[in-house]
């Protein structure tokens, strides 16, 4: 679960 980028 990334926070800065939704595509990572």
Swiss-Prot record:
Secreted among keywords: yes
Subcellular location: Secreted
Highest taxon in the source lineage: Eukaryota
Tissue: Expressed by the venom duct.
Sites bearing D-leucine, chain numbering: 4
Cysteine disulfide partners in this protein: 2-8
One example GO MF annotation: ion channel regulator activity
Entry comment, domain topic: The cysteine framework is C-C.
Further details from the record: Exists in two forms, due to cis-trans isomerization at 5-Tyr-Pro-6.
Stated name of the protein: Contryphan-In
